[in-house]
Amino acid sequence: MYFDSKMKKASQIKKILLAFATPARAKVNAWFFKTGKGQYGEGDIFIGVRVPEVRSVVKGVSLEIPLTEVEKLLQDRVHEVRLCALLILVKLFQEAKNKGEKKQVFTFYTKHTKYINNWDLVDTSAHIIVGEYISDYMEHEERLVFINKYIVSKSLWENRIIVLATLYQIKKGNEKMLFYVAERLLHHSHDLMHKAIGWMLREVGKKSGEKTLMEFLDAHIR
């Protein structure tokens, strides 16, 4: 599908996403992401757009898109539209020329976590935006305050954001941030958190070695 490679309007972006909608896939996604009553994704709306299709739309979004337009997408009821907004933020963050531009995206992201409300939305964005920013652009004390705020948050998704944010450090061979977070969230009540922590611990094993991983597990789990 052809579309303008300089898109700056939320309405234009959403229109293209809607053109990719597939009712059958929407039904499957609604089940997969637990949108039923009492489930973690209760009430979320899917239109059946595949992630590669969302990414193809993001490629056509201008780096000059105003955050006010991204906000319209992020506040949308449709899940894939919110995913698109987050992938746009990732694009803006990665293409940012300096700390100031990165901070602008990071601040916007952290002020809108109520809309980052499913595991895929967290997992496609947190390690890039939050992980890099708090690691590379915050002093130790500021970083610790931020991490603790997300650890004690009553929001499942903010809890998951801080776990996934540690992936940035893990990939650099530093597992300390994850171990700090994991120690405090190991007994979280939600299975999605157990899965997130387990995933990050496996990444530690791959990057820092089984010995490092087993020392943590022996001390905290066994």
Kindly give the residue locations of the regions a language model identified.
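Alpha-helical scaffold domains
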Residues: 2-222
